[in-house]
Amino acid sequence: MKRLTPFLLFTLAAFAAVAPFFAAPPEAVAQKPPTLYQRLGGYDALAAVTDDFIGRLATDPQLKRFFSGHNKQGVTRIRQHVIDFLCLATGGPCAYTGQDMKTAHTGLGITDGDWDASVKHLIATLDKFRVPEKEKSEVLSAISPLKGDIVGR
């Protein structure tokens, strides 16, 4: 037992000497603020918002023409692209694999009025899901720069 005591003391002293080098720096321990994606509720919440939003667009007399040429699979594909895009745009882990906005909307003849109607539907959807004003504003700020790539193509 006496032979283990010096070894044990040496081991503890060595550990105490090197332990600070393995400790996480204070900035690594600090929590990152949650992303917009997380604050919105993650993937399932974005999927629910997308379903409601697309439902509104597809039944709006002004906008339903954009969905009339798509079968169920086509609408499902659009839905997935919207979810993936929103996920990525809000800091989520998704990968958007769709076309860039200009290419995807070329030839559709989307007008400023169509854009405005779509934004109103998005706001109504976010309100339906009781998205707080701060997060709603961040979502709208994330999509507003896309207007130039979508309208008038």
Kindly give the residue locations of the regions a language model identified.
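Positively charged n-region of N-terminal signal peptides that target proteins for export
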Residues: 1-4
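Signal peptide cleavage region of secreted peptide precursors
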Residues: 22-24
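Core of compact, soluble alpha-helical bundle domains
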Residues: 26-153
